[in-house]
Amino acid sequence: MKVLVTGGAGQIAYSLIPLLLSGQVFGTNKKITLKLLDIEPCFERLQGVEMEIHDSNFPCLEELVITTELQTAFHDIDIAILLGGFPRLPNMERKDLLAKNFTIFRAHGQALEKYAKPSTRVLVIANPANTNCWIANVHAPSIPPSHFTSLSFLDQERLVHLLKSKYAATQEQTQNALIWGNHSSTMVADASQTPQQLRLEEKDKTYIQQRGADVIQKRGSSSAMSAANAIQNHLKTWCGSGEDASMVSFGVYNEEGHYGFAKDLFISLPVVITRPLEYRVVSNLELGLEEKAAIQSSIQELVEEREEVKLLLQNVLD
């Protein structure tokens, strides 16, 4: 199996790589050719990561490739984990962040189209994750949109922690905890589908929405260890047999307009795994008027981001 991690010299990659190469994601019987991509200024740091990987003698590592070249990175891969993006700097407007990441994810989408297989699965983590996923998907038309996902699992894990710590829920009682909408401060946490059918207080929802910012304030940088753990759980779930009927939160392409939500967007929705690397959106859950309005507000943010990206794309084409 050939796995690409972009932003390979970054903090999330540093926490993720041991999980990938020790068999905790794809299983201990799966040998991995790991490709790490980063930009030229980070190449020396990438070489240091390479040294540490070799010194760790991970049991699942078959081959390691470090590179700054898109062709080398994306050629013939099975899984793309897209961590690399432009971070939001102080006082940076959203449109400026979108413009920076448009350039990156346009190039990554084009590389997927040109060098990767149509069967490749893609997980986008770099923010704005949902819209970055949309950009990459648009530029890789040979790869089905259902093969692209963005990360909502970290928000779901934060909700699970809240249910355990505040409501004394067991692990089993946190099943079907869900995240809806955009991966941003507008996301909507939902515990109504758990076995206890909990109705979250507004302060609980705000806690989930602000958790990432709270980590940055305390740690001085964004979530890395918990993000890597969420990536592990997303991929492990996606590769599952489909025997577990529990719902999970994936950022997926809303081709069919589920729940009346806008089409042609990557939205965090409830899914179940049907067989390895395939999922089905659960489209028959009952949503209250208040919850649906909150989700629609979050999705409107995605609509606005998409329209801004379309302007950027038009400028490139012109």
Predicted regions and their residues:
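N-terminal Rossmann NAD(P)H-binding glycine-rich loop of SDR-like oxidoreductase domains
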Residues: 5-9, 17
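Residues forming the Rossmann-fold NAD(P)(H) cofactor-binding site
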Residues: 14
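Conserved N-terminal Rossmann-fold NAD(P) cofactor-binding segment
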Residues: 25, 29-77, 307
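Redox-cofactor binding/interface segments in oxidoreductases and associated redox assembly factors
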Residues: 80-82, 124
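Conserved NAD(P)H cofactor-binding loop of Rossmann-fold oxidoreductase domains
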Residues: 84-87
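Rossmann-like NAD(P)(H) cofactor-binding subdomain of soluble oxidoreductases
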Residues: 93-161
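C-terminal substrate-binding/catalytic lobe of Rossmann-fold NAD(P)-dependent dehydrogenases
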Residues: 139-149, 154-318
